[in-house]
């Protein structure tokens, strides 16, 4: 069988019925809420959310972007189709997504997954470079800002940066 692991944001799924996740678990899916919040008013974890939308298949193919797991992303809404960016990454980039997911998985499950099976040898593709950069509110380094500045400084002809949270500092 295929091992399926799902992380979901507890605050982002506040209105999703428990039955939805229970059915996944009953089907053999390993499911965890990311930093479950029982009493939001008294919790220091309420602002430490996980907005990552990552799918990784066998450590070789990854998908990342803005799409959630919901019917509206496939069927659209009454007022029209949902539009979002989600893209496919293969090779070493997919393994970067795998690492990001497995670190988050460890945070909530305490199950450290380091098997080489999750990081297969992948051939190099073309001359493109990809770096998966992650960040969160508890880190002291501004990882995404540093990655953007480094990428801009080292670009030869052009650069594409996509983020829903581009809030540059003043100055």
Identify what each model region corresponds to.
Residues 2-171:
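Charged, low-complexity intrinsically disordered terminal segments
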């Amino acid at each position: 069988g295929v091992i399926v692991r799902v992380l979901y944001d507890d605050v982002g799924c506040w209105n999703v019925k428990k039955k939805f996740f229970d059915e996944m678990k009953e089907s053999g899916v390993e499911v965890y809420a990311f930093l479950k919040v029982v009493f939001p008013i008294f919790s220091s974890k309420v602002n430490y959310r996980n907005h990552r939308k990552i799918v990784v298949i066998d450590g070789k193919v990854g998908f990342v972007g803005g799409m959630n797991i919901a019917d509206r992303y496939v069927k659209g809404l009454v007022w029209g189709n949902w539009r979002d960016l989600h893209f496919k990454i293969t090779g070493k980039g997919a393994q970067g997504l795998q690492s990001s997911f497995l670190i988050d998985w460890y945070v909530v499950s305490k199950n450290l997954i380091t098997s080489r099976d999750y990081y297969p040898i992948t051939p190099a593709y073309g001359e493109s470079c990809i770096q998966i950069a992650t960040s969160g509110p508890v880190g002291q380094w501004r990882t995404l800002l540093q990655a953007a500045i480094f990428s801009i400084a080292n670009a030869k002809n052009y650069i594409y940066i996509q983020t829903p949270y581009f809030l540059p500092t003043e100055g």
